[in-house]
Amino acid sequence: MDHLAHYYHAHIDELNRRVAEIVSREALSGLVIHSGQPHRMFLDDINYPFKANPHFKAWLPVLDNPNCWLVVNGRDKPQLIFYRPVDFWHKVADVPDMFWTEHFDIKLLTKADKVAELLPTDIANWAYLGEHLDVAEVLGFTSRNPDSVMSYLHFHRTTKTEYELECMRRANQIAVQGHQAAKNAFYNGASEFEIQQQYLSAVGQGENEVPYGNIIALNQNAAILHYTALEHQNPARRLSFLIDAGASYFGYASDITRTYAFEKNRFDELITAMNKAQLELIDMMRPGVRYPDLHLATHGKVAQMLLDFDLATGDAQGLVEQGITSAFFPHGLGHMLGLQVHDVGGFAFDERGTHIPAPEAHPFLRCTRILAPNQVLTMEPGLYIIDSLLNELKQNSRGKQINWNSVDELRPFGGIRIEDNVVVHQDRNENMTRELGLA
């Protein structure tokens, strides 16, 4: 924690600098950032799991307490309005007492609807950042999530401070332990549901604490890109395992994927080829490189794999240009990572939010930025046997270039994805996932 405390001081200085610049530019008194409010289930008295506003989490690791507020202007000491009601029904959050508290003036709020008494009196000159625009309107905010402020903050959130990088290393370190436990569970015969339980136990986080719903897919389920069903019964035959799962640390996410074959076979060789390709793509990352160019390079590598494993005929360039590789690799190479799994700013050209669209032939690419130091991105190439996409190839002449017998052999295995979390530095790449022990 000593390292975090040291880095945190500079982190707060940077956030204050950003706020000072944008509020001066927009002639605002400052920003009021709302952690959020509970959401109640329809016709019930139970709330959905609470998720704090990422703009709130950027300042401090208060992740599970609704009705909190930050008042910041970039000049004065940030003010934290911390919700601590008198409540005998629920666990009430303890008064904060961690390394970060010295950087805030903390005021306690006992009743959520009395927050106006603690907010600035000239509230119309402050901008509200948060989800609950109806609450902001009642409180008197006239500027609510202004585009200019949001675009500025989102653009700069892609540049991580040392504090943020350290949090993400720790999120990776935790997730690596979970991945190792899940791998062992797979080879020991566990079901998807059982693998999930062993993963969560290893990371020490519940389903609502990990940053996203884990993908635990055996066999053909690996062909479903966002598979979260978790079957309780084991398949009749154990062939393959794809796990896409992360962990959280102080609000920052890791997002890691591995694929395993149960036996040494052709599918296992394809995993080895994909692993080699993924590492080669990571070696291509450096400041000044356009992320879409890395995505296009991935399609070239997927095309070569289709040829090498007798899944398609022709030449690699032709397979890419005809969209054949997109049927086997339909998603983007990766995305920005940070406070959110699919972090903001991935399409921003500048502080004004000028949008860089994804290439027309690759609409699912989630990042079009030019790489720069201290950005963190996922690198997650894949190859899948997805019947709905391959059936489209069958409907025209492109289907003649597919070796359908080879495709049929791989169909029961579902697919492959390998994903690492990578920091772009000025003179090197830091593959957090690999460097923290996950092969």
UniProtKB/Swiss-Prot annotation:
It is an enzyme of class 3 (hydrolase). Its EC number is 3.4.13.9. InterPro entries: Creatin/AminoP/Spt16_N (IPR029149), Creatinase/aminopeptidase-like (IPR036005), PepQ_N (IPR048819), Pept_M24 (IPR000994), Peptidase_M24B_aminopep-P_CS (IPR001131), X-Pro_dipept-like (IPR052433), X_Pro_dipept (IPR022846). Mn(2+) 2 binds at residues 244, 255, 419. It holds the Pfam family Peptidase_M24. One of its GO terms (cellular component) is cytosol. Mn(2+) 1 binds at residues 255, 335, 380, 419. It catalyses: Xaa-L-Pro dipeptide + H2O = an L-alpha-amino acid + L-proline. One of its GO terms (biological process) is proteolysis. Keywords: Dipeptidase, Hydrolase, Manganese, Metal-binding, Metalloprotease, Protease. GO terms for molecular function: aminopeptidase activity; metal ion binding; metalloexopeptidase activity; phosphoric triester hydrolase activity; proline dipeptidase activity. It comes from the Bacteria. Binds 2 manganese ions per subunit. Its cofactor is Mn(2+). Belongs to the peptidase M24B family. Bacterial-type prolidase subfamily. Splits dipeptides with a prolyl residue in the C-terminal position. This is Xaa-Pro dipeptidase. It comes from Shewanella oneidensis (strain ATCC 700550 / JCM 31522 / CIP 106686 / LMG 19005 / NCIMB 14063 / MR-1). The gene is pepQ.
